[in-house]
């Protein structure tokens, strides 16, 4: 992303750590903008971005293995502060003349370090708990470096070259398990990199609007509205930037939540005076999905059909060159990068046909979910809309496990409406990050009245999270769960059992498909 000259930037280089997004997350919480980029970024690109500091993430590789990820060593000569985390510290050590070798045993979990008071640990206690996750270790530091922290298992828990402002830590300050991790990162960002911390949603809007206007010019944009928070925020942001040059296409694919379609038209079409075309494509989607049970195939079909519908609608309009989507930072990482395997394709970043005739605009693809909500409030979207439950582009299509039918959709739609109503009545909307029902491809025996039943099972998924990268199941009061279960079984046809998902992410994803 091309940033305005006055925008402070901390550049994070990706070496494949499962925590790399958390690094950018933590820095943004300090009011400093941060982006994650591939480790192969060129020196010229870095100079153009003009970052105040560079962080090298952790990663699963060993620095001494053939083909392991590396960087241009010239990065250390740019005069820009550098912080290497875990693999990033080991790589720094190797590239600057130190030595790294495989440890006798992998160190994973909490550890106690003893830190010296310096720039990185300024104001922090000497003894502190950190989170280790590595199988290699530094055995000799480069010339010019000093040890600033050690632990029972390593003499080099943290190192520094104060003159060149190059630092390394063997642990992960970005994870919550590291006791003073945020403080350490804050010291690097504020004390070492001298960032003031002035990044806000207000200046994000200013920068993004200017970028949109420069790119679009006098041309027209189609915005893909799904009914979810992300696409709604994108639509309002674009409308603020280019006004009537924006046409929103709201595809009613028959996979929406109860009352979703009418709500979108009322709140955004009328409320924001936006040009929204509602397309009834239910039969088209259901025909394509008939007999399909594989979740990846369903996602691809829904993603493709979305774009084909837009293509059909765009052919009725003149001069439309762009398609806007509500892709998030987490969407991109979960679909895999050069350093991370694909967990599952996302509807906004996978499934797009090669012959698509639009250029993509994804104005919030560097934001996390909670940042999108803050952006929505700043744009003037009412709180009750901004805090609506996250809803994936494929809609209920990925909350019906296996083949999708009208009857199954109705079960999910009605049970989900009950869940949302009870959560709202109990005042739990802000306490639970995401909650919804799913319909597993499971039937079981039950007794209702005096009769034996053999009907469907509904699953409830409710999680707590900050940004969607990790989550834990919500500890909902048993009486509330019983109320939800009782209402679903009694009010939704063909359901005789309700179960509650108590797995975290990882190992599970939030959505079931």
Swiss-Prot record:
Keyword Membrane among record annotations: no
GO cellular component: cytosol
CDD domains: GATase1_GMP_Synthase, GMP_synthase_C
Pfam families to which the protein is assigned, alphabetical: GATase, GMP_synt_C, tRNA_Me_trans
Keywords on record: ATP-binding, Glutamine amidotransferase, GMP biosynthesis, Ligase, Nucleotide-binding, Purine biosynthesis
Active-site residues, record numbering mapped to chain: 86, 172, 174
E.C. number(s) listed in UniProt: 6.3.5.2
Record-annotated Glutamine amidotransferase type-1 domain positions: 9-198
Any one Gene Ontology molecular-function term assigned to this protein's record: GMP synthase activity
Protein's job: Catalyzes the synthesis of GMP from XMP.
Protein name, as recorded: GMP synthase [glutamine-hydrolyzing]
Protein's organism: Staphylococcus aureus (strain MSSA476)
